[in-house]
Each structure stands twice: as structure tokens, then as C-alpha cells.
């Protein structure tokens, strides 16, 4: 692979495969052009150095992004488009492939869905008896700091798709994923409701900014 380092991202991808691109090169591939002062590779590197990672860059809000020199509305739209495309890819992959859910897959999917939400959203993943995904739904939407959850509605949706188990999740827009006492109480209520219909609650994940808490990992479920 001599000379690979001299290739532009598109040529490198076409010759050696997309997996050979660094984060900087992959970002440059999407941005396509740099600024008057920097070529696209230098600009992509500067962006990643400023934000620290692809995740932090794509999770940044509009004010944070357009404050960067050379990053106008066009590049802001490109970056948000990349993030949304990734979110929708995760969403469709989980259902279309009827994926067997693993803890890491669950976490990555839920983070892609909930991290950037500005209100609390309560999601449920419905699974069959082999832990394959039947569907996932955003069942409840709330405010910046609260979402009202109705356990019977969760059970009703589970029965509709003949689910044997569910995974619960909601986000904390404040950034901290630490569960509140109210979070623990509603989880207990959902577990009791589901148990009555012989539906297992496998986990409840609280998603924050770049962090999460799993009730199962803490031994609360």
C-alpha cells in the first residue's frame, strides 16, 4: 500500500476501501471542500481537534458549529445531515435485520436516537423470545426535565406485536444520565405491569451527553 498516504480520501477509498480512511479523511470526504485558508483535509483535522471526536462534532448544536471560523450554514447542514443519516441507518438496521440485541448494540442505537433530543423522550424496544427486535417506538414525549410514562400503554403495545421482552430508554437533555428517584419508581411500575402479562423488562437505559446509565448493569433489574 505504498503511496496510500498521498491519495485524497475519495481515491484512497476507491482503491483500498472505506475502512482504510481515518476519521479526518472520512470527514473530509463528506465536507468535499475546505475554506479559503485551509484545504479540506486540514479543515477536517482542525474541526476534530476543536471538538475532540466525531461524536462530539456531530452532536454539537447550531450555535457551537457556526461559531467555528469558516463553518457557515452550508457546512452546518452537511454535518447535521451526516448525523441524521447515521441515526436513521441505525434505526432501520435494527428492525430490517431483526438484529439480536446485545448490550453494546442497544446502547449505540439508543445514543444515536436520543442524545441530541432537547426534550425528554421515552423509547421502548420490543423483542421476541429470542431477543430479536420486533419494533421500536418513541411512546412518550415530555419537557426538558420530565416525561410522563404510562405503563399500561407499554404493555398494550407489547401485546400488539406479541413481544416477549422490552428494553426501556429515555434521555436527560441536561446531559447527566444519573437516574432520578422518579426514574426508578416508574421503572418499577413498568416491571410490575409487564410481569402481569409475562413480559420481561431487560433493561432501562438513561442516555446523557456522551454517557449512559444501565439499570441492568447496576443490578436494579
Curated annotation (Swiss-Prot):
Transmembrane segments: none annotated. Belongs to the UPF0758 family. YicR subfamily. InterPro entries: MPN (IPR037518), RadC_JAB (IPR025657), RuvA_2-like (IPR010994), UPF0758 (IPR001405), UPF0758_CS (IPR020891), UPF0758_N (IPR046778), UPF0758_YicR (IPR022820). This is UPF0758 protein KPN78578_39390. One of its GO terms (molecular function) is metallopeptidase activity. A motif (JAMM motif) lies at residues 170-183. Gene3D superfamilies: 5' to 3' exonuclease, C-terminal subdomain, Cytidine Deaminase, domain 2. PROSITE patterns: MPN, UPF0758. NCBIfam families: PRK00024.1 (NF000642), radc (TIGR00608). Zn(2+) binds at residues 170, 172, 183. SUPFAM superfamilies: JAB1/MPN domain (SSF102712), RuvA domain 2-like (SSF47781). Residues 99-221 form the MPN domain. It comes from the Bacteria.
Amino acid at each position: 500500500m505504498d503511496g496510500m498516504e498521498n491519495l485524497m480520501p475519495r481515491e484512497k477509498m476507491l482503491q483500498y476501501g472505506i475502512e482504510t480512511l481515518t476519521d479526518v479523511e472520512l470527514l473530509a470526504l463528506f465536507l468535499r471542500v475546505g475554506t479559503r485558508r485551509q484545504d479540506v483535509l486540514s479543515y477536517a483535522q482542525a474541526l476534530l481537534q476543536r471538538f475532540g471526536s466525531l461524536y462530539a462534532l456531530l452532536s454539537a448544536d447550531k450555535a457551537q458549529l457556526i461559531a467555528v471560523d469558516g463553518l457557515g450554514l452550508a457546512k452546518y447542514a452537511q454535518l447535521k445531515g451526516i448525523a441524521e443519516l447515521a441515526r436513521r441507518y441505525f434505526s432501520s438496521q435494527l428492525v430490517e435485520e431483526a438484529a439480536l440485541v446485545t448490550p453494546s448494540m442497544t446502547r449505540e442505537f439508543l445514543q444515536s436516537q436520543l442524545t441530541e433530543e432537547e426534550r425528554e423522550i421515552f423509547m421502548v424496544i420490543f423483542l421476541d423470545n429470542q431477543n430479536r427486535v420486533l419494533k421500536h417506538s418513541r411512546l412518550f414525549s415530555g419537557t426538558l426535565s420530565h416525561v410522563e410514562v404510562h405503563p399500561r400503554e407499554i404493555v398494550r403495545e407489547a401485546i400488539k406485536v406479541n413481544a416477549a421482552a422490552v428494553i426501556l430508554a429515555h434521555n436527560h437533555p441536561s446531559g447527566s444520565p444519573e437516574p432520578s428517584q422518579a426514574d426508578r419508581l416508574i421503572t418499577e411500575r413498568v416491571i410490575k405491569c409487564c410481569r402481569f402479562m409475562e413480559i420481561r423488562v431487560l433493561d432501562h437505559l438513561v442516555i446523557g451527553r456522551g454517557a449512559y446509565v444501565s439499570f441492568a448493569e447496576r443490578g436494579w433489574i
